[in-house]
Amino acid sequence: MGDRHTIQQNLNGLLSKLNDPDPDMRYMSLNDLYGILSNPCSSYLAHDQASATRLAEGLLKALDDQHGDVQNQALKCLGPLVARLPLEGLRTLLERLSNLTTSQTIDTSVPNTALRVIVTALPRPQPNQAPSPDANMAYSAVSEVLIPRLIGPGPHKRRGSVTKGMLEKDPAKGFSSDAIDVLIQVASCFGALLQESELTALEKAVMSIIDNDTAGTVVTKRALAAISALVVYFSDEQFGILVSELVERFNSPQLSTVHRRHLIAAVGCLARTVPAKFGPHLSTLAPFIFSAVGEDNLEVSHVLHYLCTSASNVYSSRNKPKIYHQYRQLPKEKLITGM
């Protein structure tokens, strides 16, 4: 109890110094706070909701500091803090940070970065092992709070709602590549626990970005990376549905040149990331890629390479699908060498 009492006194003192007008003092206080949170003696905070809440409030305030060094040190403290937070405290922190990502008055890259730090620091499922109770608890908070905020309210809930999904287009700022990076981190850390409905909803939110001709190059590339992170956890049935949706998009009479380029890039991501899942769908998607050959588009050449690499990996030399042999017969100046 003596150690706990001393630590609590130190924490209270450090939290009060976060209001000091001297940024150096605020930085040093956060540095000391990081040391305490990293010490096993502070593990009692997991059972002290009031103290954990005060710490979270102090760090949230420090994230809005005008000095970058102070902000960065506050971000550093979030990692060890989430290991000490009770479930309700974790939910509250995720909710607060998620709401800040759609603010019109602050630099929203900071709360997005904070969310990535938290997701990375949470206990996660390990390969070939049953998820631990801590990993299940962490996933429940991510599932209940963060994923709905990424996606936004469904159509039946949107009427009268002022809450915008983090992945939705902001009228003033456009799409957020930072929010996409949060999704990628969620998929990387908790993909094995994501429900099919969550995977589908996240995929649809990302595809709405890929479908948008006004999405910039950086945002589109991050959206493609997000699709790659998600499809690893798709069932064969889910993957088949995604392929069918891509075919519908390719066949749309309103398909623009930019949109088709984005879709071709998405096909390349699928072929590169999950070649075994992609193999059975080669003959379905290949014609859309071949139709773009000769348009002086390097992306098409890359995608053809991935398609045929997938064919080479999935099929035996005698049973390679028609696309593989079509690829080999195309003029070399249209292609990437190495096949």
Swiss-Prot record:
One of its GO terms (biological process) is sexual sporulation resulting in formation of a cellular spore. Keywords: Nucleus, Repeat, Ubl conjugation pathway. InterPro entries: ARM-like, ARM-type_fold, CAND1/CAND2. The keyword Protein transport does not apply. Disruption phenotype: Cells show a dark red color when grown on an air-medium interface that induces development. Cells are able to initiate the cycle but are blocked in the initial stage of early nest formation. Cells exhibit reduction in asexual development and block in sexual development. HEAT repeats lie at residues 5-42, 50-87. GO terms for cellular component: nucleus. Interacts with candA-C. Interacts with unneddylated cullins culA and culD; interaction occurs only when complexed with candA-C. In E.nidulans, CAND1 is separated into 2 distinct proteins: candA-N and candA-C (AC Q5BAH2), corresponding to the N- and C-termini respectively of the protein in other species. PANTHER family: TIP120. Assembly factor of SCF (SKP1-CUL1-F-box protein) E3 ubiquitin ligase complexes that promotes the exchange of the substrate-recognition F-box subunit in SCF complexes, thereby playing a key role in the cellular repertoire of SCF complexes. Acts as a F-box protein exchange factor when interacting with candA-C. This is Cullin-associated NEDD8-dissociated protein 1, N-terminal part. It comes from Emericella nidulans (strain FGSC A4 / ATCC 38163 / CBS 112.46 / NRRL 194 / M139). The gene is candA-N.
